[in-house]
């Protein structure tokens, strides 16, 4: 009885406790064990009584009562009859909730195939039986018989027979001499009769014997599925169903609408079809109907079951009454609207509201303004409870009334309730974790939420109508997490790069910039002030100006913490700013005693955060915000038309460029340059002109003008806005007052005629049209970009979601080397910036060999100076890529938590942070693919200047002096280095083939001196020997054509594709250099002086011409060598993460050796490499014709050199150079795209993602393990199996790492939940079921899906505590068992001492 009473108040059944979930194929017995009864009728509910029909789809006898504790006929009502089964209507008296849990079943009259195992590729049934899908369908859909048992006849096992052949065979051999069947029964018999163990053994033998690659792959696939069935305990015949489960009725409800109609779930329709056809089939079989009718009915039953499980996978989609496809069971799970993504991974929550946001400049950083109306609604339950506690109301109803009337005491209580109760603000789209932050609410009038201006950058919010959502954390734990982890004051640094994100912008920056200006010659210059009061007095009395240069007695703090005083030259404005700085010995006045631009302010905030901590930083930020706003208002900076100054020299520059463009046109007409070259040169000239005009304009605008009295005049307002970083950029100013410049077409090409006017002068009609042309594409791009960027983020999160910091140190000795990234001679990422916050993997030594940083040290800002001064060129650091933990990453390999500036904590979800950091700036990236030629990424570099003073050192030197007396680079791998006085290398430049050097080995250079230059638009072919020119196989009309440029009538000789001309297939066009005797000269490196020509080469020499080494024989315009598009922006990032092979992939030399040209095929050229290492095999490469090969016979290549230029395929880099090189390549390429947009992302984020892409190993030799060579195995699994083999003394397997794209890697994670909720749900679940996969619930997604705390953050520590508790429980239970075993009435043994808590 007591139990019953207890149940009254606690009707919930305890949740199942589990730590793994397994998925497998359900056997017919299993389905029957779930079922509470068979459904025999297709009826749902009675149209008059609205009660469910007996044995129908909603039957109360099978599924349970409709009302709580009430049977259908109403004989038994209420709790006291709980558990009784009514004798009249056979309904159990219980909770109606069981209708959500109880299942039914349908006994099928004929077996049917489960469509997922039949049609989901690869077809599992087909693989097991080794039959094609086409044949299977012919059997299943009753077209062909299949021979099961040929007996003594001439038929073969599993031979297909058509109706006629079957009858003929019966006539010929007699009815019982062989067995052949048709339909699902036949397949079921075949599957039932399989001996998997025997099959596995024979497949293994066959695999060892076969030589064919294709056959090996096919056998491996089959072997894998056979093993899967053997190990999972699934039986193959279960893929053919004899019983169909029916899901509980409340999960496919029938809802009455007003007007007496019903809305029903599509599943009911689908089940109805199955039941109808099944019943009809039963009746026909009882009636002994003709075979043809029964067969047709069986086929229809198969189709009905197919539609129920996966509508539209086979045949046409079954539609409902309104021509809409019915939603089958598979559709319930699939896609954005499916169960996984709609309800399990994304839920709507209560206690939330949303409203428009407005600016709240008087708020503190940790506050937000919450409208009273919203607060009242959100905190209602809290208010009710307080009213009750204070005795102001006795019932909830009374409290409700009080609140509705908005009585004064309610407002007082609301104040109490929200005090120190943080709320979460969220702005969609939440692209990174800073899109949700916690604030303390401040009650305000009005209906809009007030937001602090400094957090706008993190939310990416502005006040043009943005809305934000408010969520209330209810439980104490939630409030604690909100306050400790999510409070806006805790999110000062950006997780992507560790820079401050609480940075003033726009008017604040403008105000601070204005405050910090210093001008010469203003009243009161040179006056001396002792303290702030004097200064303010003087300002009010207008004795001095805010910008006057003055002397001030500054009180700072020295190293000991004592106050120190000194005189400084500054301005009144800067003193105001200095007074806001926290007092700290490491923070000097100098950091603000300069013109404060946005960048400078960010630097100051960073310094304050590093030296003074979070609290001081927050106070400082609030103060400078107030100062900035106030002074922006005081300054009265405006935007006037006269502030846009059109430079005086504009038209002169325009005219010169016009003449230049005319010259190029003329050169083209004279045939000196090609059309492509002319286009490039014209575009270049106009780019330069635009730049020059912009420079002239900036010079005029930024120049300090003098007033009549000789003082500095006010600075130009527009210049102030752009220079301070408040709004606008030099590029926009150029369009306002310089010239608009070149415009792009929607295709990305650049229009040759520029827009010469600017917006101040106004555009002509033609110019206006040209400018709208490209701008429209920009808008269309933006819309596409958002979707694409979101999808990239989703894939990244999915691949990295289970990357969590699980330990402090994995103890690995591995790491990756970091160097500064130098692009075209300028350092784009210094060594210091790349290793900050990472752990040293080895001792770092300076150039003298002294250890300056010990291994295992986390690099702080202080270490960077030591590295810089020590002249260290590269540092080996720990990386996520080389971390040896099985699950997750260790803290040492990850390094510093960028958002906190401290070593990373346990349980930090670094994978998700990495994904967000890379995905969030995705919307800022461009979408376009650049076509070469055009100012989009022009300013092609054509020279290198020295950035340092020093001496020249040349490595791999090969220089020739050509007939004009210039030094020419003759090899591709020559490097020029600049070494300073100490012998430290300051810069290295790789020199292009054919470049002209201005310096030689040992020369001294000054900073800014030109070292080399080259023609960026052509690739030359140079001779290495002196002699006379001869031609080989250059036949007019076959391999060479004198093309007359149609515009000019001037001839130039171009090599044409000789293989496509008649009789030209055997030609090998070349230029040879002959000696005095008329014979072809020999080269020093071996081989003849014969230079093969590629298609589109333009000859620069004639027969009989004299040449010197280094002279150009022919040139290939890079137009044709480089017509490939440069994929830029988002598509490039996606391409790299997906590890796609680029369209024109570079061909990489797998070994070091000598190039040899072999015999050519019809449309391929054969190149082989003779290895240096004689034990190696030579490698052959086939290269499509028309590809420009810049190597000659006899050239020496290193391992990893490019044989054909292009983007290398990441897989090739991994295969040839290994993981470290691959990581370096991917990190640099991805960073380059982001760098172009000025987005900073720390390398470690990209490394985390790349680590996830390298989780698989391809087995090359299976050894004595169960693995199959050629299959891809998880690294962890691979190591585990090898360990096992080692212990047993067997031969271990070998494998090579494989690079998977992020989509593929997500689908191949160990967790099937995670993969199924990502993409291709059916395929993933089918495969998981066949393999009987177990999901260990280790990642974040799986745990969210099953409704648990995620194993990261606070969830990780909870998991740890739970683990300890379970260990202790086990100890106690074991001890109890021991005591129970000792039956003797001895005194109870002491309980064991508990292990100390971890």
Curated annotation (Swiss-Prot):
Residues annotated for Zn(2+) 1 binding in this entry: 71, 73, 86, 89
Cofactor dependence: Mg(2+); Zn(2+)
Key words of the record: DNA-directed RNA polymerase, Magnesium, Metal-binding, Nucleotidyltransferase, Transcription, Transferase, Zinc
Residues the entry annotates as binding Zn(2+) 2: 810, 883, 890, 893
Biased composition (Low complexity): 1380-1392
Region (Disordered): 1377-1398
EC number: 2.7.7.6
Record-annotated membrane-spanning stretches: none
Enzyme class: transferase
Domain of life: Bacteria
GO CC terms: DNA-directed RNA polymerase complex
GO molecular function: DNA binding; DNA-directed RNA polymerase activity; magnesium ion binding; zinc ion binding
Biological processes, Gene Ontology terms: DNA-templated transcription
Pfam annotation, one family: RNA_pol_Rpb1_2
Xref: SUPFAM superfamilies: beta and beta-prime subunits of DNA dependent RNA-polymerase
Alphabetized Gene3D superfamilies for the sequence: 1.10.132.30, 1.10.150.390, 1.10.1790.20, 1.10.40.90, 2.40.40.20, 2.40.50.100, RNA polymerase II, clamp domain, RNA polymerase Rpb1, domain 3
Record-linked InterPro entries: DNA-dir_RpoC_beta_prime (IPR045867), DNA-dir_RpoC_beta_prime_bact (IPR012754), RNA_pol_asu (IPR000722), RNA_pol_N (IPR006592), RNA_pol_Rpb1_1 (IPR007080), RNA_pol_Rpb1_3 (IPR007066), RNA_pol_Rpb1_3_sf (IPR042102), RNA_pol_Rpb1_4 (IPR007083)
Binding residues for Mg(2+): 462, 464, 466
CDD domains: RNAP_beta'_C, RNAP_beta'_N
Cofactor, free-text remark: Binds 1 Mg(2+) ion per subunit. Binds 2 Zn(2+) ions per subunit.
Catalysed conversion reaction: RNA(n) + a ribonucleoside 5'-triphosphate = RNA(n+1) + diphosphate
Main function: DNA-dependent RNA polymerase catalyzes the transcription of DNA into RNA using the four ribonucleoside triphosphates as substrates.
Subunit organization: The RNAP catalytic core consists of 2 alpha, 1 beta, 1 beta' and 1 omega subunit. When a sigma factor is associated with the core the holoenzyme is formed, which can initiate transcription.
Family to which this protein belongs: Belongs to the RNA polymerase beta' chain family.
Protein name, per record: DNA-directed RNA polymerase subunit beta'
Species annotation: Bradyrhizobium diazoefficiens (strain JCM 10833 / BCRC 13528 / IAM 13628 / NBRC 14792 / USDA 110)
